[in-house]
A protein has these predicted regions:
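Conserved N-terminal segment of class I S-adenosyl-L-methionine
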Residues: 1-108, 112-114, 128-132, 164-168, ...
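Short beta-alpha junction loops
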Residues: 81-82, 147-151
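Short aromatic-enriched loop/helix-cap "lid" or pocket-rim segments at secondary-structure transitions
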Residues: 88-90, 153-158
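Short catalytic micro-motifs in class I SAM-dependent methyltransferases
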Residues: 114-121
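A short, conserved alpha-helix within the catalytic core of class I
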Residues: 122-133, 137
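Conserved beta-strand signature within the Rossmann-like core of class I S-adenosyl-L-methionine
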Residues: 138-149
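Conserved Class I S-adenosyl-L-methionine
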Residues: 157-179
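A SAM-dependent methyltransferase catalytic signature shared across enzymes that methylate proteins
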Residues: 173-191
């Protein structure tokens, strides 16, 4: 008898550990979420500081990993609207426009910049501008996501849910757009159905040393699978 699997993920049955994917214990399917890509790219990388952009009420992505496993010395969380309460005191809250971050933190001020669920809420021109800013802020790595499609029925569906006017969808992103500007993406995993199909995950090693050490090279580019 065949049918759609009611997935049971191994991470729900085992103690927490840094993972680069989760596997269904029933059908063997593999899925990778934002945290999995963070771990994949930074597990062997010394990281002392992280900037999370678009933090909102959910808090920084991979918070437990950064604080308790990587033991970062300083974290920054940036959001123009709201930031989760009761965060670990290691996180400094920056309630501000992310396009002004260079004025506050300065170039090469953090090891890693991450921005998930953020780019799609900027106009495309501002999205590219943010990517340039993030590259200036980071010493080692920038990793972001961008919505490929709307995650709801209308561009303002999130605004109607939580009242945050900045949650309007203003742009959509494709893997090729990142490849054209020299970034790597999750295309290989996306094509296999392992990534969330509504987003592209993209990253750039500002320090090329870590690109070589990660082993993630041209295989993550369209046409090089």
């Amino acid at each position: 008898m065949t049918g759609r699997c009611d997935h049971v993920w191994d991470r729900s049955l085992e103690p927490w550990r840094p993972r680069t994917f989760m596997r269904c214990v029933k059908c063997g399917a593999i899925r990778r979420d934002f945290e999995h890509y963070v771990v994949m790219l930074t597990l062997d990388m010394p990281v002392e500081s992280v900037l999370d952009v678009g933090t909102g009420n959910k808090g920084p992505v991979a918070e437990h990993y950064w604080v308790h496993y990587k033991r970062i010395k300083r974290g920054y969380v940036c959001d123009i609207w709201t930031i989760k309460e009761n965060l670990n005191p290691i996180w400094v809250k920056l309630k501000m426009n992310a396009l002004d971050l260079l004025d506050v933190l300065g170039p090469r001020s953090v090891d890693v910049v991450q921005a998930f669920g953020f780019l799609e809420h900027l106009e495309k021109e501002d999205g590219y501008r943010f990517l340039e800013i993030a590259e200036e802020l980071a010493r080692k790595l920038v990793i972001v996501s961008g919505a490929i499609t709307l995650h709801g029925p209308t561009p303002d569906y999130k605004v109607k849910i939580d009242g945050n006017p900045y949650h309007l969808y203003r742009s959509l992103w494709r893997h090729e757009e990142f490849h054209r500007i020299g970034w790597q993406t999750d295309w290989e995993y996306y094509a296999r159905g392992e990534s969330y199909m509504g987003d592209v995950i993209a990253w750039k090693f500002v320090d090329p040393t870590w690109r070589r050490k990660s082993g993630l090279g041209q295989a993550t580019r369209v046409g090089h699978l």
